[in-house]
A protein has these predicted regions:
Chain C
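Catalytic Walker B motif of ABC-type/P-loop ATPase nucleotide-binding domains
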Residues: 143-147
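Conserved ABC ATPase "signature" region
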Residues: 85, 89, 96-114
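Conserved structural motif at the start of ABC-family nucleotide-binding domains
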Residues: 3-5, 18
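ABC transporter nucleotide-binding domain
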Residues: 159-175, 179-237
């Protein structure tokens, strides 16, 4: 047994990659997630509308960070802003007592607001929770969860697609056939795309039925978002596949891309609560934007126009992944040509 | 025009020179064999000729064009692992290749493969899958056929049959580049390129390679001490049916140490040893 | 007392890897198993050392066997010395005798100068020699080597065979498998395997003598029992009838194995 232990020790010490993972990874992960994990709400972007727009803001608790004060805007305008996610709280002033509109799809902000208002009630101020009146956790979690599951499974499955070809030697054959690198990329994604699309529908349907998640908006923006999101998730998988030497490595990398998405995409810990140094990682993750789109459509009934930004970003991410993967393929399938070009 | 022209081709992986200043050509209808042990650089060379690996220096041209720009349809390749999809059937594999190259799928009956058409490649014996890979590589009538150790692990009958097929393909005008580590297969090639440690140590047909090289045959009954002495002097000692043969030392030197010996023409294997020393 | 297999059959599900195969390996002698990939050489080796169960027949195996698998058996990220020390430790060999034995083996194989080199940095020939040394280190009575010479250059092959002969000279029984028919003459006995079945067995001379019919050489093929050999064709005549335009030649082992394979094919 001693001989065995000694041998293993020697092998591990020589395996620099695994050693780096064992020592460096836990430290990095702790730092990143430590700064990310926070339910504390520091600011709630707020809008004040109606005739009281000028003097109401100073009366509001500090937590309500007034970004817009528009005397000419109406309650309908305020609801629009909330639906589009521009602000998460609106104070509607008018003839009667002011009404506070809360965005129920931002659970922690809504709860923080309710707490503050209950603790130090402003006389005559009433509040209404829009979009998730019960402040139900599942309603807020399920859309994001669905996305997480899809990204996890989708990336994992496609991450092995190219590696398998390399291991069986068929990648070389593809390289000597008249295929263009983008043919190979799209061909590899296509079947998974179809299956995963059906998957998303199933997962979201079950989610809405079992967990009482509403579907308040039109399905179109959701579909657009889901398709763009899928393209990115599967594309990342293929990209991982093209840089992995074997299936074990591919799975490792796929898992490593899944972990940050749980913690940093805003599905559990709100992005606004994260330290800025860590928050930017969240802005690079496709799940962050799918979460915004899914919650926006399902809970807030947001339309295409409201969700233009996250949708555009998803499409942009897709384009970046596509370019990276195709470039990577080109250097693998036609290295001699790449050389000649330089 | 030479179909395949390799000039001063080199490939370095860090400190290791996998291929070192290699030059050779393959003409239309010619069978050229890359001969050498594992690690001599045969597979690396082939991958550079196919454009799968970029050389560190030197160049490879196919039909006068740099390999990166060659129309893939001019190439046919059977790698060591055969390059077939194990979960797909023979028919599906061949159809995929045919479609990729834009030709009609081959006639399975004519190739003697109809009984295996709907069997998965992963379930068939090596001999059959080798033939399938061979068909897949030439169904688009390539100008160049590159075969990486097609006879590795094949018994004598299988090897003979494979070489028959290779000769038939060459007769249609295809240039064939084959690699092997069986010395006796040098006879099957029009020309051989002997490789050792990435370098070309000889080229030509079998008689040209052997030409003039002599070995000293020594009858059995020589002590180990004497053999060690021969080795110290720089000779290589090989076993033969009836004694020892010494490569690399002249008769006079050998006789002095051992007391006897006759000069005989070298075998191909002995020539290889002498040239790669 | 010879080691080996007696009419052993090994099945994996529906496939029969070995069918009624017998082989004897005498102490102090080298038995050679020749066959193509998939013929059953590796299964035979693994069965003989006890890594595979059998579905019929008997195995005669000593307590101490040494085995070198097809993949050389060397650990790539350990040095030559560490590889040998590991084997010594695994077998619980006493330190001093083990160290002496390791030194002797390093000298005999010529690996002394490479003792601190990592397994993956060794040339093919050196790696194979190390693998054999590791199999022999524990002083087994039966040594089984699976394709130690495949893919090696002629000089390394010769050095490996010298090492094997030396080890046989120490009284060990050795079984070596190979795909090169010309290596069969290095052994005391040969077994030709094809598809799990024995095509021929005995000493090389016996096997060649036992070939049925006669062998001819011609510039052209003649019927289904012809095959290319270099620039000419070999033609087998099962009934020893002369073939027009061909000259009779004496067969070597490769010819005999080919004939046996042809005959087996005809029977199927």
């Amino acid at each position: 047994m001693l001989a065995m232990t000694l041998k293993e020790f020697r092998q591990v010490v020589r395996d620099h990659r695994t050693l780096a993972m064992l020592i460096v990874m836990p430290v990095v992960l702790l730092l990143v997630f430590g700064y990310a994990a926070s339910f504390d709400v520091d600011v709630i972007p707020t809008a004040v509308v109606g005739p009281g727009a000028t003097n109401v803001p100073e009366q509001l608790p500090e937590l309500f960070d007034v970004e817009t004060a528009d005397a000419d805007a109406t309650r309908a305008n305020a609801e629009e802003m909330l639906r589009a996610g521009e602000v998460n709280l609106a104070v509607v002033t008018g003839d009667g007592p002011p009404v506070v509109l809360l965005d129920g799809s931002e659970l922690f902000m809504a709860r923080a607001a309710v707490q503050i208002l209950a603790a130090a009630p402003i006389p005559g101020l009433d509040y209404v929770v829009l979009f998730n009146p019960e402040l139900d956790t599942s309603a807020v979690l399920v859309p994001g969860l669905a996305g997480l599951i899809i990204v996890f499974v989708g990336t994992l499955v496609t991450s092995m697609s190219v590696v398998r070809e390399r291991e069986t030697g068929t990648l070389e054959q593809l390289a000597v056939m008249p295929f263009r690198p983008r043919d190979v990329f799209m061909g590899k994604i296509a079947p998974y795309f179809l299956i995963a699309s059906i998957d998303i529908v199933i997962v979201l349907t079950i989610g809405t039925l079992l967990f009482d998640v509403p579907l308040n908006g039109s399905v179109l923006p959701l579909i657009v978002g889901a398709l763009a999101f899928l393209f990115v998730a599967l594309g990342v998988g293929v990209l991982i596949s093209s840089v992995s030497e074997n299936q074990a490595q591919a799975i490792q990398l796929a898992l490593m891309t899944a972990l940050p998405q749980i913690m940093l995409s805003g599905i559990i810990f709100p992005l606004s609560s994260m330290a800025p140094a860590v928050r930017w990682i969240g802005y690079l993750l496709p799940l962050t934007y799918f979460n915004q789109v899914a919650k926006g459509v399902m809970l807030r009934g947001a339309g295409l126009g409201d969700l233009l930004m996250p949708l555009a970003l998803l499409v942009a991410l897709g384009a970046v992944i596509f370019t990276l993967a195709v470039t990577r393929f080109r250097s693998q399938l036609r290295p001699a040509r790449v050389r000649a070009a330089t | 025009m030479r179909v395949v022209a390799v000039t001063a081709l080199s490939k370095r992986f860090g400190e290791v020179r996998a291929v070192d200043d290699l030059t050779f050509e393959v003409g239309q209808g010619e069978i050229v064999g890359l001969l050498g042990a594992n690690g001599a650089g045969k597979t690396t060379t082939m991958r550079m000729v196919l454009g799968l690996l970029a050389p560190t220096s030197g160049r490879a041209l196919i039909e006068g064009e740099p390999v990166g720009r060659v129309d893939r349809r001019r190439l046919g390749y059977v790698p060591q692992g055969l390059g077939l999809y194990r979960e797909l059937t023979v028919a599906e594999n061949l159809r995929f290749s045919a479609e990729a190259f834009g030709t009609a799928p081959p006639d399975l009956a004519a190739e003697g493969l109809s009984e295996y058409a709907n069997r998965k490649v992963g379930e068939l014996p090596r001999g059959v899958t080798r033939r399938v890979a061979f068909v897949a590589a030439r169904l688009h009538d390539p100008g160049v056929l590159i075969l990486d150790e097609p006879t590795s692990g094949v018994g004598p009958l299988g090897r003979a049959r494979l070489w028959e097929s290779i000769h038939l393909v060459a007769e249609t005008g295809t240039a064939v580049l084959v690699s092997t580590h069986h010395m006796e297969e040098a006879e099957e090639c029009d020309r051989v390129v002997l490789m050792a440690q990435g370098r070309r140590v000889a080229t030509g047909n079998v008689s040209e390679v052997i030409s003039g090289l002599r070995t000293v045959a020594v009858v059995a009954g020589v002590t180990t001490a004497r053999l060690d002495e021969i080795r110290r002097l720089g000779g290589t000692v090989l076993l033969s049916n009836d004694g020892w043969r010494v490569v690399g030392l002249p008769l006079s030197v050998v006789s002095e140490v051992v007391g006897s010996g006759t000069e005989v023409p070298a075998t191909f294997e002995e020539a290889f040893v002498a040239l790669s020393a | 007392m010879s080691w080996g297999l007696s009419r052993v059959t090994v099945r994996f599900g529906d496939a029969t890897a070995l069918a009624g195969v017998s082989i004897d390996v005498e102490p102090g002698e080298v038995a050679i198993v020749v066959g193509a990939d998939g013929a059953g050489k590796t299964t035979l080796c693994r069965t003989l050392v006890g890594l595979e169960g059998i579905d019929g027949g008997e195995i005669r195996r000593p307590d101490r066997t040494g085995f070198q698998p097809e993949t050389s058996g060397v650990w790539n990220d350990l040095t030559v010395m560490e590889n040998l020390e590991f084997v010594a430790g695994a077998y619980g060999l006493a330190t001093d005798p083990a160290r002496r034995r390791i030194e002797t083996l390093l000298e005999v194989t010529g690996l002394g100068g490479a003792r601190d080199r990592l397994g993956r940095q060794l040339s093919g020939g050196m790696r194979q020699k190390l693998g054999v040394a590791m199999a022999v280190l524990s002083d087994p009575e039966l040594l089984v080597l699976d394709e130690p010479t495949t893919g090696l250059d002629p000089v390394s092959r010769l050095e490996l065979w010298s090492f094997i002969s030396l080890t046989a000279g120490e009284g060990k029984a050795i079984l070596v498998t190979t795909t090169y028919t010309d290596e069969a003459r290095r052994g005391n006995s040969v077994l030709a395997l094809d598809g799990g079945r024995s095509l021929a067995s005995g000493s090389v001379a016996e096997v060649i003598d036992a070939m049925p019919g006669a062998l001819f050489e011609s510039a052209r093929s003649h019927g289904p029992s012809s095959w290319r050999r270099g620039r000419t064709w070999r033609i087998w005549s099962p009934e020893a009838e002369p073939v027009p335009g061909a000259t009779e030649v004496s067969p070597d082992l490769a010819d005999v194995v080919t004939v046996a394979a042809l005959a087996a094919e005809a029977r199927r």
